[in-house]
Amino acid sequence: MNIFVKLREAIKESCVEAMNQIDASRIAIYLFHNGVRSTHGINFFKVSCICEKVAIGSGIRERMIEHNSIPINLFDEMVSKLMADNRYIIMNNEETQNTNSKIFISADKIHYTQLIALYDINNNILGFIAVEMSKPYSKDGADKEQEILNELAKQLIPVLSYSDYTAIQTQ
């Protein structure tokens, strides 16, 4: 249990720093995992929020408890594009309100949510970083945010790869 607390603290510390750099309203780490199997042994893959930070005064609430074991088949297009492009942007508009990806928009004041893929050292997708932004979308701004979030992803890989993290801690 102690290692779990240390892992979460290491993740949260890195997330807060990135959140402050890009002025995000919320930052969260989501990991893909295996869910329950069907009677024929087919795995049901899911995604869960393992860590989040909400900016003080943002007017949005934490979502970690409700963003637990969500079936990824609800987000086939989103996950496919995230894997292909390493990035996916969800705009808060009428079109999004008719899709399952709206769960990544916490409040009306959020203009967009940017997802950045997380990969392990073997280039297998682990999950994604989600940042919710209250400021209006601009391509240049989102590209700058992506650069910072890509750096965060690099920092998180050894922490999320538990065996690598324990090796680093013992050095």
Question: Which residue stretches match the model-derived regions?
Answer:
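Short acidic, S/G/P-rich loop/turn micro-motifs used as interaction or catalytic elements
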Residues: V36, E95-Q97, S134-K139
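A short, aliphatic-rich beta-strand micro-motif
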Residues: H111-D120
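Short, glycine/acidic-rich beta->alpha junctions
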Residues: A10, D108-I110
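Intrinsically disordered, low-complexity terminal regulatory regions
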Residues: M1-S58, Y162-Q171
